[in-house]
Amino acid sequence: MLLSDKDIRAEIDAGRVRIDPYDESMVQPSSIDVRLDRYFRVFENHRYPHIDPSVEQADLTRLVEPEGDEPFILHPGEFVLASTYEVISLPDDLASRLEGKSSLGRLGLVTHSTAGFIDPGFSGHVTLELSNLATLPIKLWPGMKIGQLCMFRLSSPAEFPYGSDRYGSRYQGQRGPTASRSFLNFHRTQV
């Protein structure tokens, strides 16, 4: 069941959902807006001949922070990692989806490529996968609204929520945009 504004506020007020910093004006009818942090991970395309998810490629990205109050410029066709300004913490019976903002999508900004789902038990900054599909550069201002979280109540609490030892939750407690850690539990079935 998708939570309404009333339910979202109740979960936050009860301390079951943590959004830090919390701004009540960000609550929408069935979601809560999240803002863009000031850190970005840009890809160093000259470091490797290809991307291989089965091995660690530590130098594949580098951290960039715009100076002062300057925006980050996302060029046409460019893909970068960023993160929410807010730290999000979910209980074991709520999951969430990060969706883009319609107004930004109409400018050509894609907020997440594939990973918009947030498991119950997750705590940390949510990494964003930003792409510019427009033909002009897009200014990304730290602190601007970048997406919205909708929350769903599970039919029962997760037996092994994100962060439990069972799944080796690679991104629990992440700070800022976190590069892929797919190599830590890469799985390939022989076909």
Swiss-Prot record:
Pathway: Pyrimidine metabolism; dUMP biosynthesis; dUMP from dCTP: step 1/1. Its EC number is 3.5.4.30. It catalyses: dCTP + 2 H2O = dUMP + NH4(+) + diphosphate. DCTP binds at residues 101-106, 119, 127-129, 148, 162, 174. Transmembrane segments: none annotated. GO terms for biological process: dUMP biosynthetic process; dUTP biosynthetic process; nucleobase-containing small molecule interconversion. One of its GO terms (molecular function) is dCTP deaminase activity. It is an enzyme of class 3 (hydrolase). Keywords: Hydrolase, Nucleotide metabolism, Nucleotide-binding. It holds the Pfam family DCD. InterPro entries: dCTP_deaminase, dUTPase-like_sf, dUTPase_trimeric. The record marks 116-117 as: Important for bifunctional activity. The active site is at residue 129. Disulfide bonds: none annotated. SUPFAM superfamilies: dUTPase-like. PANTHER family: DCTP DEAMINASE. Belongs to the dCTP deaminase family. Homotrimer. Bifunctional enzyme that catalyzes both the deamination of dCTP to dUTP and the hydrolysis of dUTP to dUMP without releasing the toxic dUTP intermediate. HAMAP family: dCTP_deaminase. This is dCTP deaminase, dUMP-forming. It comes from Streptomyces avermitilis (strain ATCC 31267 / DSM 46492 / JCM 5070 / NBRC 14893 / NCIMB 12804 / NRRL 8165 / MA-4680). The lineage of its organism: Bacteria, Bacillati, Actinomycetota, Actinomycetes, Kitasatosporales.
